[in-house]
């Protein structure tokens, strides 16, 4: 009987710890509307690990990854390894979702998903994969999404590349650092990868 009670208490503690990682009504990495009045020591950029889920546009992925790495961020890459037209959208989504699961297990500081394409056929599996990231307390940024998830609680920001480097764009590394540190930011950010 005592073992059952201890197991029940342990399960309750696990559930509470998971719930504590998810902000109410806000996406992980998008909870601040203003900078705190008291300065704090935040995560140093060399301690930020980025889980980068690739897209079918490997050239664009390479530019983004190189820009992140050039700014001393540690990037782990999950390639979709597609062979072209023979790959179905569902298989591509499943491969990307497996990469997300791997990054949660690796405990990265942020997950970037390049070219996400949420369709009616894969909506539930995307929602589940992104919910798992949310419950782990890891922010998600969508880079050049084709179709983003409807639930905006599943991602902190959309990053759109602006390689013309207009006055409105920021470096992709600066955007990622801002999201990771949970500093105030727009929901859609123009980023430069060059």
Feature annotation, model-predicted:
Residues 19-26:
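Bacterial signal peptide processing site
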Residues 95-109, 129:
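Short, well-structured alpha-helical segments in soluble
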Residues 70-86:
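Short beta-strand elements in bilobed, periplasmic/extracellular small-molecule ligand-binding domains
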Residues 1-19:
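Sec-dependent bacterial lipoprotein signal peptides
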Residues 142-161:
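Glycine-rich, charge-decorated loop segments at or immediately adjacent to ligand/cofactor-binding or catalytic sites
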Residues 112-114, 137-148:
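Short beta-strand elements of ligand-binding domains
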Residues 156-194:
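Extracellularly exposed regions in secreted/surface proteins, prominently low-complexity, repeat-rich
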């Amino acid at each position: 009987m005592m073992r059952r009670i201890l197991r029940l208490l342990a399960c309750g503690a696990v559930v509470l710890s998971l719930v504590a990682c998810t902000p109410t009504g806000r996406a992980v990495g998008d909870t601040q509307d203003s900078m705190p009045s008291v300065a704090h020591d935040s995560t140093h950029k060399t301690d930020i690990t980025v889980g980068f889920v690739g897209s079918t546009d490997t050239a664009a992925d390479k530019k983004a990854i190189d820009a992140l790495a050039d700014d001393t961020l540690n990037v782990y890459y999950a390639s979709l390894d597609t062979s072209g037209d023979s790959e179905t959208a569902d298989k591509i989504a499943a491969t990307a979702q497996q990469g997300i699961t791997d990054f949660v297990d690796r405990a990265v500081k942020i997950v970037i998903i390049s070219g996400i394409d949420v369709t009616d056929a894969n909506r539930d599996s995307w929602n589940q994969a992104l919910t798992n990231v949310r419950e782990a307390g890891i922010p998600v940024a969508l880079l050049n999404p084709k179709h983003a998830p409807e639930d905006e609680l599943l991602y902190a920001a959309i990053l759109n590349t602006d390689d013309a480097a207009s006055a409105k764009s920021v470096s992709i590394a600066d955007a990622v650092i801002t999201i990771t540190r949970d500093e105030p930011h727009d929901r859609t950010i123009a980023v430069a990868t060059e």
